[in-house]
Amino acid sequence: MMVESESIRSTPTSQNGVGSLPNQSDSCVGREGSGSGETNGELNPAELLHFQQQQALQMARQLLLQQATCLNSPSTDNKQPSVQVPVSVAMMSPQMITPQQMQQILSPAQLQAVLQQQQALMLQQLQEYYKKQQEQLHLQLLSQQQAGKQQPKELALGNKQLAFQQQLLQMQQLQQQHLINLQRQNLVGLQSGQGPVPMQSLPQVSPSDLHQLLKEMSSSQEESSKQDTVDLMTSITTSFPTTKVSPPTMHPSLSNGQNTRRESTSHYESSHLLYGHGECRWPGCEALCEDMGQFIKHLNTEHALDDRSTAQCRVQMQVVQQLEIQLAKESERLQAMMTHLHMRPSEPKPFSQPLNLVSSASNNKMSHDTFPDGLPQPPTSATAPITPLRQGTSVISSSSLPSVGPVRRRIVDKFCTPISSELAQNHEFYKNAEVRPPFTYASLIRQAILETPDRQLTLNEIYNWFTRMFAYFRRNTATWKNAVRHNLSLHKCFVRVENVKGAVWTVDELEYQKRRPPKMTGSPTLVKNMISGLGYSALNASYQAALAESSFPLLNSPPLHNSSGSVLHGGHDDVTSTGEPGNSNGSSPRLSPQYSQSIHVKEEPAEDDVRPASISAPTNQTTVLPEDRDLESESPMEDLP
């Protein structure tokens, strides 16, 4: 308002004492004008008339002071206009001063300048107003096009709203033109302090009519804004559950029936997730719809935005959440299964049948004849059985193997589950999973030959059996074939026979059973101390007392050596020898008479290239190595762990 105090002229105001008076008076007028603009809607007609008279008197005094200032201050600028009119006079409204008063106060040139200023200001305001209206309409159209979720009813409502806004703009334009004409006739002026949106009225309109007109205009604007807000909230509330149900897919149709405008009906039909194969896929609704138009009509009528559709949407959200939880659980279960299958368990399977080391020679001989393949032998005496052999042998292996990591499966595991039963139980696993089988090449070759009806295979047939039974050999480099040929030529249990088919390989079971790992011999006291020191705490008292005695008549016979070796070694066929070849003296694997008071105790081998840790023994302890035919020196790089 302080800007209105300055007069519109090109030359600066003189700096004498008289020139400061109009500024003060103008500032007072501006403050009073602003006050009047603020309180105009609250004054009664009598107070308003009195206020207008005071404004006219102040205007007259201001005009006189302005003229006096112009006369007293000499002009030095050639561009000084001949007519000077203060802005406050140009901004005076008809309620403040009547045309008669203006004619009495102002000269004709000043009146013309006031009219020109009013017209220029009004044109500027009209341009700004129309520009803002166009921007608002453009934003509304863009928002509707981007949303693309208007139904025909809502589109018709939007068209009506646009038509109403256009009519309102036309009425405002006509009103502005009428006001300009009236201003040219020197009847009305522009209201001071008016905003960019002019709402003018005729001077003859009473204050009550003006108030009613303003109320109607504000109510219409509120209704339009409320409608826009309702549309926006509807789009938000309907799009939220759809996005919650299926986040990665943008639904072309929302739960309240709103659909996007597509370029082609076929593309819209193919991408609509609630319509397929001629029926509605809304949960719980299987209504038949012949075409897309009928489906859209059904969707808008039966599945509109109501309580039932909202409840169904919430139920669908809960269903999806439950499925996500179930999927997470199943994924964790699958991960645990994969981890278990790819990592061998730390503890082997428990042994089911207890064994006896003390038995008669005849029973041992019969058992050895009955179980030629080294299978577990049942107990043959009524003596108390020992604890499962797995525990004691595991202790021996752990004492002789300080290293950790992927190691050869222990003989006790093979003793509990022979290779035939192992392959039968885990046939599908080895066939599909790329896991290295825990058996030596010799045992696998023997198993391949025994599975054939005629007990003979060619070299290519052995290769095919390896690749057919194990995914590991099928998917890795075929360097393992060298190890197969090496084992076939090394071990005397594999016999090469020439027949009609060519060269075939067979297996000699008796020769195969003679294959034994390095054995340790010692006195019975050593055996007792070693077994008790290595964890045989669960041995019963009768067995410990039997070991403490000096004479073992039942342990001296050769069949018992085989039986005890079968028990301690598990009768298994594939243990790699780690003894040094230089120590072999070509003696028979049976013990000489001077070692008749000793028994055989198996030393668990470590990796193929690592010698086992020796166990301390008395001076009479002697290690006897079998002959060369018992050695199973496979290729170090190709030996199975």
Curated annotation (Swiss-Prot):
Localisation per UniProt entry: Nucleus
Ranges for region ctbp1-binding: 354-358
Biased composition (Basic and acidic residues): 600-611
Region (Leucine-zipper): 320-341
Pfam short name (any one): Forkhead
Biased composition (Polar residues): 8-27, 239-259, 576-599
Composition skew (Acidic residues), residue ranges: 629-641
Assigned GO CC terms: nucleus
Description of its domains: The leucine-zipper is required for dimerization and transcriptional repression.
Name of protein: Forkhead box protein P4
Name of the coding gene: foxp4
